[in-house]
Amino acid sequence: MPGVNRKEQRRLEAKAREEKAAKLKPLKAEFAAIEIDIAKLEAEKATLTQQLADPGFFQDAGDAPKAMKRFSEIETILTIRYSKWGDLSDRLEKADTT
């Protein structure tokens, strides 16, 4: 920066880094929370997939419909979470390069 001494330049650069970090912090926190949520949902989906693959599971008339309903709910939630995850990923990438 012309007209700015080295110490002032370092101070301005540090301030810019701090502002950028403050801007990214909530996005990173939301991104991490969504990743955790996705992992939990994927684990639950895997468990339900195993249960639903067992023909004996359908002998209990009460559990099978509940499991099928929950599986469908998880699929819907995961679609939304992955979309949000992708949006946040794009926003973080753009914010990190500016």
List each model region and its residues:
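Charged, heptad-repeat coiled-coil alpha-helices that serve as long linker/dimerization "arms"
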Residues: 1-98
